[in-house]
Swiss-Prot record:
SUPFAM superfamilies: C-terminal domain of alpha and beta subunits of F1 ATP synthase, N-terminal domain of alpha and beta subunits of F1 ATP synthase, P-loop containing nucleoside triphosphate hydrolases. It comes from Acholeplasma laidlawii (strain PG-8A). InterPro entries: ATP_synth_asu-like_sf (IPR023366), ATP_synth_asu_C (IPR000793), ATP_synth_asu_C_sf (IPR038376), ATP_synth_F1_a_nt-bd_dom (IPR033732), ATP_synth_F1_asu (IPR005294), ATPase_a/bsu_AS (IPR020003), ATPase_F1/V1/A1_a/bsu_N (IPR004100), ATPase_F1/V1/A1_a/bsu_N_sf (IPR036121). This is ATP synthase subunit alpha. PROSITE patterns: ATPASE_ALPHA_BETA.
Length: 501
């Protein structure tokens, strides 16, 4: 029998002890107490922080939404039907993040950043938290560059600047989304990235939008985040924050971004649903007390950075749906007070055939005027007052009273102004064409024309600025100086195109 070498065994054990590396991980694990309606109540995550990402079985993710004394409330993303009582929940000590980067351009994704368009995986340049603080006051710059929509009534009366937050508000089926989509299409060739956040929209609507943007060559610079009407309230809730994080990535690269939130009424309803399920105290219209903060922290992330910090910008166009034209309701008044102005679409105007149905009296742009071209201010500066006077005179004239010649001229000019401001869907007008049209109106070149001839003249102006030598020269001057320097050239061109109607 071989003799056992005690020393050798002792040395071997000693070496094993020295080579042993303890791989101890300290994890925070909780247990699901109850789960229903995309909400889980979890016991045991005593160190959880608000907004933290947690992991559950079956690759389901969660976001810490409520902190109670003995448990936490978590909103779930993924196959929530597979989660059951007693399942483990692991805290990650990470804030909820989404992929951002150039690879998202031209893609349709869900609010988690997963592709929905069957075009393959997305290679992220970085991962941003969905909740990020708004840029510091000292990092911001002045809003002094215009963001042209191609819609005459907006560019002339309610101009939008890069970095502005302009609310689009009105009843359903009045053209709110159409204005937003036309603005995206008008950014073609202008080096502006567009982010469209669809909240509670039908999937067929988004499919049609993708086709339209492809036809208009606008998809390549657009990111679409779709939280469809059939999705859980949890996805609808995080969708605008995901869009804002994607937009911030491009802004920090020094680029100009346009973001559309369509619409924040449905976002508020989704948040109300989650809050009520979490048994939070409800207030006015059953919304929770922090509903204002929900939207203020989102919209404050838009703005323009100073040149020292890259000079990028995020222009936000949130959309809100009203009921029976009531803009004094809770959510509309909240968002009106947060934004830098609003475009109010009126159902009455829409049914009268005035489209886009923007009520110039109730619409305002608080900061866009500082970004507007000087040429547009020269020709459309008095247009808002003239239009208001026309509306007043028109209502007076309905009584059949005899009008003096001056009032008849004002009435005729007003009707022509309304006709000029009408615009078909996706029929976008560039700035030089708009300026020449308003110059012709203000200086009497349309006084002897009927409405049909005015439509013909507008078409000739747009065509002449691209084909006619005088028109090309005028266009170049307007684009370079952004002001009317040579009135003789302007009037020569208008006289020339008038011959063709």
């Amino acid at each position: 029998m071989a003799k056992i070498d005690i020393d050798q065994i002792g040395a071997l054990i000693q070496k094993q002890i020295e080579d042993y590396k303890a791989d101890v991980r300290l994890e925070s694990i909780g247990k699901v107490l109850s789960v229903a309606d995309g909400i889980a109540t979890v016991y045991g995550l005593s160190q959880a922080i608000l907004g933290e990402l947690v992991e559950l079985p079956h690759d389901v993710k969660g976001l810490v939404f409520n902190l109670e004394q003995f448990h936490v409330g978590i909103i779930l993303f993924g196959r929530t039907d597979l989660i059951k009582e007693g399942d483990n929940v692991r805290a990650t000590k990470k804030i909820f993040e989404v992929p951002v980067g150039e690879d998202l351009l031209g893609r349709v994704v869900d609010p988690l950043g997963n592709p929905l368009d069957l075009k393959g995986t997305i290679n992220a340049d970085a991962y941003y938290p969905i909740e990020r603080p708004a840029k510091d006051l000292m990092h911001r710059g002045f809003i002094n560059e215009p963001l042209h929509t191609g819609i005459k009534v907006i560019d002339a009366l309610v101009p939008i600047g890069k970095g502005q937050r302009e609310l689009i508000i009105g009843d359903r089926q009045t053209g709110k989304s159409t204005i937003a989509i036309d603005t995206i299409i008008n950014q073609r060739g202008k080096n502006v990235i567009c982010v469209y956040v669809a909240i509670g929209q039908k999937d067929s609507t988004i499919a049609n939008l993708v086709k339209l943007l492809q036809i208009k060559d606008a998809l390549d610079y657009t990111v679409i985040i779709n939280a469809g009407a059939s999705k859980e309230a949890t996805l609808l809730y995080i969708a605008p924050y995901t869009g804002s994080s994607i937009a911030e990535y491009f802004m920090e690269q020094g680029k100009d971004v346009l973001i559309i939130y369509d619409d924040l009424s449905k976002h508020a309803v989704a948040y109300r649903e989650l809050s009520l399920l979490m048994k939070r105290p409800s207030g006015r219209e059953a919304y929770p007390g922090d509903i204002f903060y929900l939207h203020s922290r989102l919209l404050e992330r838009a703005g323009k950075l100073s040149k020292e910090h890259g000079g990028g910008s995020i222009t936000a166009l949130p959309i809100v749906e009203t009921q029976a034209g009531d803009i004094s309701a809770y959510i509309p008044t909240n968002i009106i007070s947060i934004t830098d102005g609003q475009l109010y679409l009126e159902q009455k105007l829409f049914y009268q055939g005035v489209r886009p149905a923007i009520n110039a009296g109730l619409s305002v742009s608080r900061v866009g005027g500082s970004a507007q071209w000087k040429a547009m201010k020269q020709v459309a500066g008095t247009l808002r007052i003239s239009l208001a006077n026309f509306r007043e005179l028109e209502s007076f004239a309905q009584f059949g009273s005899d009008l003096d010649p001056s009032s008849k001229r004002r009435l005729d000019r007003g009707r022509k102004t309304v006709e000029i401001l009408k615009q078909d869907v996706h029929e976008l007008i560039d700035m030089p064409s708009q300026i020449v049209t308003f110059y012709a109106l203000e200086n009497g070149f349309m006084d002897d024309l009927n409405l049909k001839q005015i439509r013909s003249l507008m078409a000739e102006i747009e065509q002449g600025l691209s084909l006619n030598e005088t028109g090309k020269k005028l266009r170049k001057e307007l684009v370079e100086h952004k002001a009317i320097k040579d009135k003789a050239l302007m009037e020569l061109f208008i006289d020339h195109v008038r011959r063709f109607i």
